[in-house]
């Protein structure tokens, strides 16, 4: 039986620009917002859009990501007719190898895709923060009788040269694609979200492999090839909040934007929840000496210091006299007595010693996973 649409999440990115935060885990597994990991947003969008089968394509440091996703039950993807499948590079008789690009990762998993037998494939990135109804995008794809639909978002003209830009006619049909143009003709930036008719994409990828044609990347190869061959390629115009958190600055900004009673992501909208793996932790304890203002404090935290406009993830400890401002503290971190942290990201399990000062006023500071700063050796 043919399934309508299969989602494939590209989650193998190393995320080198995130430095210490991705030395031991893939970028989509990085924590966000106190109780989530970045990939939770793509997975939750799939669940909320009614997509039953999701393939997660991993490569770099997949252990934390695999453990987090498990069997997909946190997103309702563990039913009889649904599933979350981790797809990793493997060796085969015809020379499967490490993924050479985004579309090459799809080609290497043709057998899995064929086993689902979808009419459409939805290609997603696992490292963006946003909420989107993929079913609405699919309807646009059908209405346009498209072979490929690319989700786009309007960006300021001065930033357009950082993106792949789609130039369209009055009906949103793409007539030209420019990869990071110096002088952009439009502000419609690709979000790295695509819907393809699977039969057509499959044929193109297989033929390219047989004929030794480079078709390894959607932006560099596949989209230009579709346009050159006259395929019906359209945009889906997205107007909501979307953030590429591929740099330290953008990850910090997205977390700071997430704080607040009514943020642009509408995080408290119960009609479109963001799901994640449930971690059991005791209730928070806020001491008499503590002062917490305009902050998100997740389960299991012990706070005896001052916290302002910050996020404390699960099981964070803030000792007496410590001061945290405009910072994102990941789970299990310990902030020592009298420490002062400003505009920083503190990694999971990090320990900050007494009276240590971390000042990110000029540039956001990062403390890595399990990193110890200013704590004497116990030996």
Swiss-Prot record:
EC number, UniProt record: 2.7.7.27
Catalysed reactions, as listed in the record: alpha-D-glucose 1-phosphate + ATP + H(+) = ADP-alpha-D-glucose + diphosphate
Class of the enzyme per the UniProt entry, highest EC level: transferase
Keyword field contains Nucleotide-binding: yes
Associated pathway: Glycan biosynthesis; glycogen biosynthesis
GO BP: glycogen biosynthetic process
Classification via SUPFAM superfamilies: Nucleotide-diphospho-sugar transferases, Trimeric LpxA-like enzymes
InterPro entries from the UniProt entry: ADP-Glc_PPase, ADP_Glu_pyroP_CS, GlgC_bac, GlmU/GlgC-like_hexapep, NTP_transferase_dom, Nucleotide-diphossugar_trans, Trimer_LpxA-like_sf
Annotated alpha-D-glucose 1-phosphate binding sites: 164, 179-180, 190
Keywords of the record: ATP-binding, Carbohydrate metabolism, Glycogen biosynthesis, Glycogen metabolism, Nucleotide-binding, Nucleotidyltransferase, Transferase
Pfam families the UniProt entry points to: Hexapep_GlmU, NTP_transferase
Single GO term (MF): glucose-1-phosphate adenylyltransferase activity
PROSITE patterns cross-referenced by the UniProt entry: ADP_GLC_PYROPHOSPH_1, ADP_GLC_PYROPHOSPH_2, ADP_GLC_PYROPHOSPH_3
Subunit structure as annotated in this protein's UniProt entry: Homotetramer.
Functional description taken from the UniProt entry: Involved in the biosynthesis of ADP-glucose, a building block required for the elongation reactions to produce glycogen. Catalyzes the reaction between ATP and alpha-D-glucose 1-phosphate (G1P) to produce pyrophosphate and ADP-Glc.
Homology family: Belongs to the bacterial/plant glucose-1-phosphate adenylyltransferase family.
This protein's name: Glucose-1-phosphate adenylyltransferase
The organism of origin for this protein: Streptococcus mutans serotype c (strain ATCC 700610 / UA159)
């Amino acid at each position: 039986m043919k399934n309508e649409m299969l989602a494939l999440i590209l989650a193998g990115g190393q995320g080198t620009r995130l430095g210490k935060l991705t030395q031991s885990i893939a970028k989509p597994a990085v924590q966000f917002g106190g109780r989530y990991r970045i990939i939770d947003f793509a997975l939750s969008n799939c669940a909320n859009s009614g997509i039953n089968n999701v393939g997660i394509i991993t490569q770099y440091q997949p252990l934390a990501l695999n453990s987090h996703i498990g069997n997909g039950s946190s997103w309702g993807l563990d039913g009889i007719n649904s599933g979350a499948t981790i797809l990793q590079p493997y060796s085969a008789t015809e020379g499967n190898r490490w993924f050479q690009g985004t579309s090459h990762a799809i080609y290497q998993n043709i057998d899995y895709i064929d086993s689902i037998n979808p009419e459409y494939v939805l290609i997603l990135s696992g490292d963006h923060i946003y909420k989107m109804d993929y079913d609405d995008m699919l309807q646009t794809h059908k209405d346009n009788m498209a072979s490929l639909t690319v989700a786009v978002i309007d960006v300021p003209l001065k930033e357009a040269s950082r993106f792949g830009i789609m130039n369209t006619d009055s009906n949103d049909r793409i007539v030209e694609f420019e990869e990071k143009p110096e002088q952009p003709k439009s502000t419609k930036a690709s979000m790295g979200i695509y819907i393809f008719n699977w039969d057509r994409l499959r044929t193109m990828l297989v033929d390219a492999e047989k004929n030794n044609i480079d078709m390894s990347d959607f932006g560099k190869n596949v989209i230009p090839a579709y346009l050159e061959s006259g395929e019906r390629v359209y945009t889906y115009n997205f107007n909501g909040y979307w953030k590429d958190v591929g740099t330290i600055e953008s990850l910090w900004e997205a977390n700071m934007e997430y704080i607040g009673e009514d943020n642009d992501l509408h995080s408290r909208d119960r009609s479109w929840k963001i799901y994640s793996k449930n971690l059991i932790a005791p209730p928070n304890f806020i001491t008499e000496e503590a002062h917490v203002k305009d902050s998100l404090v997740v389960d299991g935290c012990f706070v005896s210091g001052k916290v302002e406009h910050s996020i404390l993830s699960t099981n964070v400890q803030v000792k007496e006299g410590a001061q945290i401002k405009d910072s994102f503290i990941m789970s299990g971190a310990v902030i020592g007595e009298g420490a002062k942290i400003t505009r920083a990201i503190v990694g999971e399990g990090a320990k900050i010693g007494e009276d240590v000062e971390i000042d990110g006023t000029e540039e956001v500071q990062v403390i890595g996973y399990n990193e110890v700063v200013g704590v004497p050796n116990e030996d």
